[in-house]
C-alpha cells in the first residue's frame, strides 16, 4: 500500500468514526473504544491536513512561475515549500507507525556474566552501573531487585527495576550479548582478553496484565548468600518462586525481610510471564524486529566495547563511537540508542509506503 493510500484510509476512518459517534447515544464499550480510536487518529489527520495544505500551496506557487510580476516571489515560495514538505511527510509517517503498547512502561533489566570468568563478571558490573547512571541522567528510578556478586567486585547476575516515562522505548534495543575487549586487572602480561555479558530488557507487567493463580506457584525459601557462596543471613529470608505451568523462575535475596523478597520476586515473575505472553501473541512483530535490529537473543553479539581503542561499536547498524568512557558513564549512551531508534523507525516507515 502506497503512502497516499495509507493517508486516504486514515482520513476515511477518522470521518467514519466522527459520523458514528455523532449518531451514537453514548456509553458502552463500543462507544469508549471508538472515542479512543478517534482521539488517536486526530493528530494524524491534523498532520495530513498540514501536508495537503503545503502541497496545494506548492502547486499554486509553481503556477505563478510563468508570471513575470510574481516569478521571484513564487520561486522563493517553491524553494521554501519543497524544503518543508519532506519534513511534513516524515512527521506523518512517524505518526502512522504502529505503537508498541509497552513503550511507555518501565522495565526489568537483567545482566548476566557470560564467557570470560572473573573478567566477564566485572564487565557485567560495568554494564549494570552504566544503565544506573543512564537512568539517573533521564530522571528515572533505578532499583536493584537481585544481585549475585563475586569476590573481586563483579556480578554473576543481577536484576534491576527501572521506572519512568518511556523506559522500554529507549532500552528495548539493549537486549543481547555485549562484548568487551580489554586487559583484565588480573592479567600481568598486558594481553587483551575478550569477555561477554548478556542483557535482557523486559517491559514491566502490571497486576492486571497477568493473572497468576496461587495453585500454579511453588515458593521456596532459603538463606541468602553473598560473594563466594557464604551465608549472610541466619534465617530463610531469600525467596524463589516457580510458575509451574511455564517453568518460569524468579528469585530475590536482597532484602532482610522474607516478605519484601517475595514481593520483589513476584514482581519479576509477573514481568517475565507478561513478556513471554507478549512475544508469543505477536510473533510477526518479533520477527520484524529481528530483521531490523537483531533478535536480542543471548547468542547474538550486538555491541563491542574496546578499551585499548576507546571504541564502542554497535554491530547491528555499523555504528562506531570513540567515546567509550562517556558511554559507560551513561552520559553518551543516547548517542548509541538514538540511531537504533531511527533505524527501527526508518525500516517500519518503508513498510507503510515511506
Curated annotation (Swiss-Prot):
PTM comment text: Methylated by PrmC. Methylation increases the termination efficiency of RF1.
GO CC list: cytoplasm
One Pfam family cited in the UniProt record for this chain: RF-1
Source species of the chain: Rhodospirillum rubrum (strain ATCC 11170 / ATH 1.1.1 / DSM 467 / LMG 4362 / NCIMB 8255 / S1)
N5-methylglutamine: modified positions: 230
Gene name as annotated: prfA
This protein's record includes keyword Cytoplasm: yes
Record protein name field: Peptide chain release factor 1
Record keywords, A-Z: Cytoplasm, Methylation, Protein biosynthesis
PROSITE patterns: RF_PROK_I
Alphabetized HAMAP family for the sequence: Rel_fac_1
Amino acid at each position: 500500500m502506497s503512502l497516499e493510500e495509507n493517508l486516504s484510509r486514515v482520513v476515511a476512518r477518522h470521518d467514519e468514526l466522527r459520523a458514528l459517534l455523532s449518531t451514537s447515544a453514548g456509553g458502552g464499550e463500543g462507544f469508549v473504544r471508538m472515542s479512543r480510536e478517534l482521539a488517536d487518529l486526530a493528530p494524524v489527520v491534523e498532520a495530513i491536513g498540514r501536508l495537503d495544505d503545503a502541497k496545494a500551496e506548492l502547486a499554486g506557487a509553481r503556477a505563478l512561475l510563468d508570471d513575470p510580476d510574481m516569478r521571484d516571489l513564487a520561486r522563493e515560495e517553491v524553494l521554501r515549500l519543497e524544503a518543508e514538505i519532506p519534513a511534513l511527510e516524515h512527521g506523518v509517517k512517524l505518526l502512522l507507525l504502529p505503537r508498541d503498547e509497552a513503550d511507555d512502561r518501565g522495565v526489568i533489566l537483567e545482566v548476566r556474566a557470560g564467557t570470560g570468568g572473573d573478567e566477564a563478571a566485572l564487565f557485567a558490573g560495568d554494564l549494570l552501573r552504566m544503565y544506573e547512571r543512564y537512568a539517573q541522567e533521564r530522571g528515572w528510578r533505578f532499583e536493584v531487585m537481585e544481585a549475585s556478586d563475586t569476590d573481586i567486585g563483579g556480578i554473576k547476575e543481577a536484576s534491576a527495576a527501572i521506572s519512568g516515562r518511556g523506559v522500554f522505548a529507549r532500552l528495548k534495543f539493549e537486549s543481547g550479548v555485549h562484548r568487551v575487549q580489554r586487559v583484565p586487572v588480573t592479567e600481568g602480561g598486558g594481553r587483551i582478553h575478550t569477555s561477554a555479558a548478556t542483557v535482557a530488557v523486559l517491559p514491566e507487567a502490571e497486576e492486571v496484565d497477568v493473572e497468576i493463580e496461587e495453585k500454579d506457584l511453588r515458593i521456596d525459601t532459603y538463606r541468602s548468600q553473598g560473594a563466594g557462596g557464604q551465608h549472610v543471613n541466619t534465617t530463610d529470608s531469600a525467596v524463589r518462586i516457580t510458575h509451574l505451568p511455564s517453568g518460569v523462575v524468579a528469585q530475590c535475596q536482597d532484602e532482610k525481610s522474607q516478605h519484601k523478597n517475595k514481593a520483589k520476586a513476584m514482581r519479576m515473575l509477573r514481568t517475565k510471564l507478561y513478556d513471554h505472553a507478549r512475544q508469543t501473541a505477536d510473533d510477526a512483530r518479533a520477527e520484524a524486529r529481528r530483521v531490523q535490529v537483531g533478535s536480542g537473543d543471548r547468542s547474538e553479539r550486538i555491541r563491542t566495547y574496546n578499551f585499548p581503542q576507546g571504541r564502542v561499536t554497535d554491530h547491528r547498524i555499523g555504528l562506531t563511537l570513540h567515546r567509550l568512557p562517556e558511554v559507560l558513564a551513561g552520559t553518551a549512551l543516547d548517542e548509541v540508542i538514538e540511531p537504533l531508534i531511527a533505524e527501527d523507525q526508518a525500516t517500519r516507515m518503508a513498510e507503510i509506503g515511506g
